[in-house]
Amino acid sequence: MRLANEGLTLIICGAVFLNGTLLSGLVLAVDQDVDPPLEEYMAAQRSPEFDTPEQAVEAFKSTMSGGDFNKLAQLLGLDAHKAKSSDGATDNYAAIQSGVKEKLVIEDRDGGKVLEIGNQLWPLPFPLVKSQDGKWAFDTYAGLEEIANRRVGENEISTVDTVRDYVGAQEDYASEDRDGDGVLEYAQKLISSDGQHDGLYWPSEQGGDESPAGPALVDGNALEKAKAGLGYNGYRYRVLTGQGGNVAGGIYDYIINGNMIAGFGLVAWPVKYGITGVKTFVVNKSGIIYEADLGDDTTMVAEKIRAFNPGDKWDIVSE
């Protein structure tokens, strides 16, 4: 099996910065810079108020048809410069603009109004709400919270897919003698040493068979983020080389006489808890993925996970 999986390749290319002694310092350093607080995306002036929700909707439609990103930011109460510089802002704006031309539906929800856009009725994150004085405006903070929540969900779905791909990549790796030592073994590292095939990933220009993690990435920007220790889709990863007492068979190392032949594992945890993800995931050779919410101490707890050992607080991820 060959996995041409960009996600798995990205987490592996970033792994050189996440293994061993470099991990703790880098985690603490980048956690402070991953995302500013939601308030920093808000404009100094609040979003404009309207006498009726219909007026607010017409203002939204007019702004979108005019193609002015700054005016949309003002209508939603956002800092235009910071909103425009965020990842995917231009593409998202174009998609919303196109969707508004297809269809725009107004739905009542929780005492306010939600704009559903396009044929797929994508809900605009910023709801229309009524103030105590009877005026209507787009709720900036609620919209930013919703965007963050949606991103968490998307990141977690992507991470589960990547973890599944990791299991397949390890089995692929062990199907051949990759390092020429006469032993069929699993990879103890995500990224191979220079000129070697001792990890799940090696660059295609190195020659020989394609690595189990797939070809080198075309998306250089995403690759650089992974290399900088920013993770992939909000998550960091580490190979686990043993299992604990909560697992059938008890405590033992997967590495025997220097070769990882007794199994393999992986842990994936959010770069910034509550912002890029909530759940932490672990998997072993069985392919059954477990998840747990480790709370505000997620980074500290995940740094110490070296063995596959899900306990009572861990649940099996549903298919």
Role assignments for model-derived ranges:
Residues 1-11:
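Bacterial N-terminal signal peptides that target proteins for export
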Residues 11-22:
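Bacterial N-terminal signal peptides
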Residues 30-62, 143-168, 172:
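Short, low-complexity N-terminal intrinsically disordered segments enriched in polar/charged residues
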Residues 67-79, 185:
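Short, well-ordered alpha-helical segments enriched in acidic and aromatic residues
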Residues 77-125, 226, 230-233, 238, ...:
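Surface-exposed, charged secondary-structure patches
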Residues 113-116, 120-157, 161-164, 288-292:
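Short beta-strand edge/turn micro-motifs at domain boundaries
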Residues 173-275:
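Flexible, glycine-rich surface segments
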Residues 265-319:
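C-terminal soluble interaction/assembly domains
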